[in-house]
Amino acid sequence: MGSSEKLLTLARGEIGNREMPAGSNRVKYNTEYYGWEVSGRAYPWCCVFLWWLFRRAGAAGLFFGGARTASCSTLMDYAKRNGLFVEGNYRPGDLIFMRFSGSGGPQHIGILEEVRGNTLVTIEGNTSADNDAAGGQVQRRERPLRYVLGAYRPDYEEENVTQQQFDAMM
């Protein structure tokens, strides 16, 4: 199983996890990221959730060069600077940057599970049906392309197979 499928399998297993109490940002992903239990508006965790997934999947080096960030904007800038940013032809495992209103940088991020025409199916941390970018749960969401700014495409191992390795698999 390649890195992107490991991440998606792990993400699927997290669906339904939520912060307690609601609205606190107190969630296991933040606790692991910061090293202690945090709460309050200063600790949004959509990007932290993705950091946690990569770390748990044994692929920490594919997220932000192995470093940490809780900022969607910082991660998008990194992807652009390192040739990992794509706009279109999205694939499962891409990290999708979203903006729901106004102009500017990303407000939210999730991992792409499936493309359905003009809709992307993502798994996201800190979302809900009532609050796109700060909803306090891990959920599978369907996002219209109009919200998508682009994606960070990590350099997954299954995309780096040599011709000899490919022939051996066949």
Model region roles, listed by residue range:
Residues E19-M20, S71, P144:
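Poly-acidic low-complexity segments
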Residues V27, T69, R141-E142:
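Positively charged, low-complexity intrinsically disordered regions
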Residues V115-N160, D167:
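Active-site signature of cysteine proteases
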